């Protein structure tokens, strides 16, 4: 949550500063006043990080929902060797900045702010209801004055003008209709010319729907109360409303009255105590802080009709920039966290919830013979996670391709640094390093591979989000992410279709991945476990099975429950047995 709030503030700030720049340029060099509605773009920018990017579910051909059993014949694999490597857990705890506590604190603060501001909003709304209820209808003489002032304007039915005894300054608000309230004393004590200015000014607020937009913006400011800039923008909207209402008055009076109108504003602001403390209405006297700007705008007023093309261009340009920068801030959010491409093969839905039990995750298997996928929890299988130690499959292949290691010599000497597992504290070759998931072995390979080479290979393989980050242990709960479905697709394509890597390198890699071998099948695979700040949060088992009649690529991922590589391997074997892939156990 904290990350989303930060991204929202940054996104909001970027568009806010951009609009300020546009306003400055247009005002200084073109005497053009941007409409206050452009500030809605800042709200949209602030909300984008919270909008879940959802695409329609991909439809596959010939989808079958029946639970399958894969046919298995008892032909001999022509192997007389029985091999079983024990399941072991070799995972280290990764210490990262703990966002959980920050998330909890920021969420609590946000909720408190929302409650406080919601109460303030409700209180303001109830006060408007009170003002409406205690307002009085105008008498005939007062109606005639209003009709004379607004003679050249279409008096809309949704605009109501009334008087009130309890207010000191004219105000305009929306409560089902646009209501303009004039202090009762004004019809007696204020000269007709000054009353005309006041009525025109308040009528402009109602005509432009300023008060309705003020309510809408206040609602958004409650939702985005975590962002201090939203309150600055709200003040700017109120200021823009007043300036726009002043322009409306100037357009409806003679030029020789401009000075008198300015004096009326000064007299009202300086001599009448500031009345309007309601956040949902506009008051004629306004705040003293706005007086200088209003007077300058009256003096420099450009009363020519302003082109809407400039406004449209700025809105479109800003919107495009907003989309681009939001994707940058979200770290390629569309591609980082979900695999979106449709499968062009048949696939079959599985129900393996009983085997998964309390574990949350997914299972994907591909049959080479049938050219068909078998998927449990398709939605989850498209979510991307850190590959952790399953990425060592690719580091090994890259190391073989770059001749950092080879089939004749894949040994690396131990640097005598003490590691958490005894199996790591010795000389390693590819087989032992893969079996014991020795971090230092594969980190040493990675350190000798240029970043541009890795980036090229990941692009060719279409490996997950291809994000190498700082290029330091990027596969261990860091920038690189891949989905369970992609694990199967990428691994299968690399071993079966990729011509860049030699057959010799593929055979050596396979040898290091061998787990079980008997007369019925050969099981190859690699586990992966993600532990962050002592918490297990990611478990993988990726591999393939060779039987007498077929070859199957598979991957199991666990995201909750008991998410470890060891548990993922146990679940995988149960599913493969149930489906008949590991027949004859």
From Swiss-Prot:
Transmembrane domains' residue ranges: 5-22, 32-48, 105-122, 312-328
Result of changing residue 201 to A: Complete loss of transcriptional repressor BlaI cleavage
GO CC, alphabetical: plasma membrane
Effect of residue 439 to V: Exhibits enhanced beta-lactamase activity with cephalosporins as substrates but not with penicillins and carbapenems
Active-site residues (renumbered): 389 (acyl-ester intermediate)
InterPro entries: Beta-lactam/transpept-like (IPR012338), Beta-lactam_resp_regulator (IPR052173), PCN-bd_Tpept (IPR001460), Peptidase_M56 (IPR008756)
Post-translational modification: Carboxylation occurs on two lysine residues. Carboxylation at 'Lys-392' activates the active site serine residue for acylation. On acylation, the lysine side chain experiences a spontaneous decarboxylation that entraps the sensor in its activated state.
Primary residence: membrane
Effect of mutating residue 389 to A: Complete loss of the acylation step
Residues the record lists as N6-carboxylysine modifications: 392
Listed GO MF terms: penicillin binding
Sequence ranges on the Extracellular membrane side: 1-4, 49-104, 329-585
Cytoplasmic topological domain: 23-31, 123-311
Keywords: Cell membrane, Membrane, Transmembrane, Transmembrane helix, Transposable element
Pfam families in alphabetical order: Peptidase_M56, Transpeptidase
Subcellular compartments: Cell membrane
UniProt-annotated stretches for the region Beta-lactam antibiotic sensor domain: 331-585
Membrane topology: Multi-pass membrane protein
Family affiliation: Belongs to the peptidase M56 family.
Family annotation (NCBIfam families): blaR1_generic, sensor_BlaR1
Function: Integral membrane protein involved in sensing of the presence of beta-lactam antibiotics and transduction of the information to the cytoplasm. Mechanistically, activation of the signal transducer involves acylation of a serine in the C-terminal sensor domain upon binding of the beta-lactam antibiotic. In turn, a conformational change occurs and the signal is transmitted from the cell surface to the cytoplasm.
Protein name: Regulatory protein BlaR1
Organism: Staphylococcus aureus
Gene name in the database record: blaR1
